[in-house]
Amino acid sequence: MAGGKCIALIAHDQKKDAMAEFARRNQDVLADWHIVATGTTGGRVLDACPDLKVTRLKSGPLGGDQQIGAMIATGDIDMLIFFIDPLTPMPHDVDVKALTRLAVLYDIPMALNEATAERLIKTLNH
């Protein structure tokens, strides 16, 4: 994936519908990018937008967050969009913190909510 444009998409369970809708609304822009996503999120995005190039990794609790973190560290991810659910307790909260830390450390654009994601998406392909 080196040299390509790649966006990582992750969404907590209560935000997966919002992520699928976000992808559907922005599929014209996302079509020019390769997408990696945690397993269930990637499946939901593909259901909404079957023509997008999506690589599904493991589910977040099974290591998908760490797979995306490793891709950030190797320079294979250019942007992270992670719709978090602040109202639901997360048993894998440390994974969220680790992923956020890597995005900050490697200085990649990161959105943790839909409003920020919409603004970031508008900067692509310009």
UniProtKB/Swiss-Prot annotation:
The active site is at residue 65. HAMAP family: Methylglyoxal_synth. Catalyzes the formation of methylglyoxal from dihydroxyacetone phosphate. It catalyses: dihydroxyacetone phosphate = methylglyoxal + phosphate. Belongs to the methylglyoxal synthase family. Signal peptide: none annotated. Keywords: Lyase. GO terms for biological process: methylglyoxal biosynthetic process. GO terms for molecular function: methylglyoxal synthase activity. Substrate binds at residues 12, 16, 38-41, 59-60, 92. Residues 1-126 form the MGS-like domain. It comes from the Bacteria. InterPro entries: Methylgl_synth, Methylglyoxal_synth_AS, MGS-like_dom, MGS-like_dom_sf. One of its GO terms (cellular component) is cytosol. This is Methylglyoxal synthase. Its EC number is 4.2.3.3. It comes from Rhizobium rhizogenes (strain K84 / ATCC BAA-868).
